[in-house]
Design a protein with these regions (language model features):
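Catalytic cores of soluble, metal-dependent hydrolases
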Residues: 2-12, 18-93, 101, 105, ...
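Active-site metal-binding loops of divalent metal-dependent hydrolases
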Residues: 12, 98-99, 127, 176-177, ...
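Active-site histidine-anchored catalytic micro-motif
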Residues: 91-160, 170, 263
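Active-site environment of divalent metal-dependent phosphoester hydrolases
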Residues: 132, 179-181, 276-278
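An alpha-beta-alpha
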Residues: 165, 169-181
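Short gly/pro-enriched beta-turn/loop segments at secondary-structure junctions
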Residues: 165-169, 187-189, 218-220
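Short, glycine/polar-rich helix-capping loops at beta-to-alpha or helix-loop-helix junctions
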Residues: 179-189
């Protein structure tokens, strides 16, 4: 039976000071994302890009916080649309946009999981844990808050009410290599599973990923994958405003996506923080499209390769 995917763009950049993420969804489409997935036999429904209207400014006790009203509106909209997309397709893909959008997408797919009576797990592929609350962020950039919000950790009275918080024990973070003190405390306090780049260097990506997937399967869970461009090493993926040296290699990233495909447990996907303004002739957008295709079933033998015989 043909599997289906809804594609939904969220050109949001209110969660960061760095302009350019607003162009992310268009860049991924231009790089051929939809054609690549259709070539793998998926039925794709591109629902275009979401938008919000003008918002009345909201103040916060933390003076660093900026664009709070816009981010709140995006979260509310994305939560509703992500819940619907998860119900209407096998593996919806949400195109960012900065990572604050995942506060909305995770809230939405968590609501969908709750309706099905199944637990939601999250694989967080990122250089950062994004575990700030509004009172702990020093930069005021709200793309650093989605995990804390989605798990109900900290004061988020200014965000939309969260109906279904994700259990922090069902998180798995990989590729982490930049953690602020407040985030570190939350990781320790809640026992969040984190595999930083040192751990990946020591064990490889498959061992922790296999163990996490076994937990998802044992619980009959749904799995949301949130993929931030800065998970990758900036040497292969320069189009991100939060580059951190020492990220995942081309092969490590493809191996993760191929392994996830083989496991058959992924039920939703974020592709976030692509900033085409910082790209080099579209190389990062093309790489992200290739990685998404690996998750959707592409293998090396699916491609035409040049023979040197």
């Amino acid at each position: 039976m043909t599997r289906s995917s809804i594609i939904l763009g969220a050109p949001i950049q209110s969660g960061t000071h760095q302009p350019g993420c607003v162009m992310g969804p268009a860049s991924l489409r231009t790089a051929g994302l939809i054609a690549s997935l259709e070539a793998l036999g998926w039925r794709i429904e591109d629902q275009g890009d979401l938008s919000i209207g003008p918002q009345e400014a909201m103040a916060h006790a933390n003076p660093a916080v900026h664009h709070l009203a816009e981010t709140r509106a995006w979260i509310a909209l994305l939560a509703a649309r992500a819940e619907a997309a998860a119900a209407q397709s096998d593996l919806p893909v949400f195109l960012g946009g900065d990572h604050s959008m995942s506060a909305g997408t995770m809230a939405g797919v968590a609501a969908h999981a709750a309706r099905l009576g199944r637990p939601l797990f999250v694989l967080w592929l990122d250089a950062h844990p994004d575990l700030h609350s509004l009172d702990t962020t020093e930069s005021g950039n709200l793309h650093g808050t989605p995990v804390a919000y989605a798990c109900g950790l900290g004061d988020f009275a200014a965000y939309p009410p969260l109906a279904h918080a994700i259990d922090p024990s069902r998180l798995c973070m990989m590729g982490i290599r930049s953690v602020d003190p407040a985030e570190h405390r939350r990781i320790l306090d809640h026992g969040i599973e984190v595999h930083d780049m040192r751990a990946i260097d020591e064990t490889g990506v498959v061992a922790p990923l296999r163990a996490f997937i076994e937990r998802v399967k044992a619980a009959n869970g749904l799995l949301h994958v949130s993929f931030d461009v800065d998970f990758l090493d900036p040497g292969i993926a320069p189009a991100v405003g939060t580059t951190v040296p020492g990220g995942a290699t081309f092969r490590e990233a493809h191996l993760i996506m191929e392994y996830l495909c083989d496991a058959g447990v992924v039920t939703s996907l974020d592709l976030v923080e692509l900033n085409p303004f910082l790209d080099e002739r579209g190389r990062t957008a093309s790489l992200i499209c290739d990685l998404a295709a690996s998750l959707f079933g592409r293998r090396v033998l699916d491609r035409q390769t040049r023979s040197f015989a």
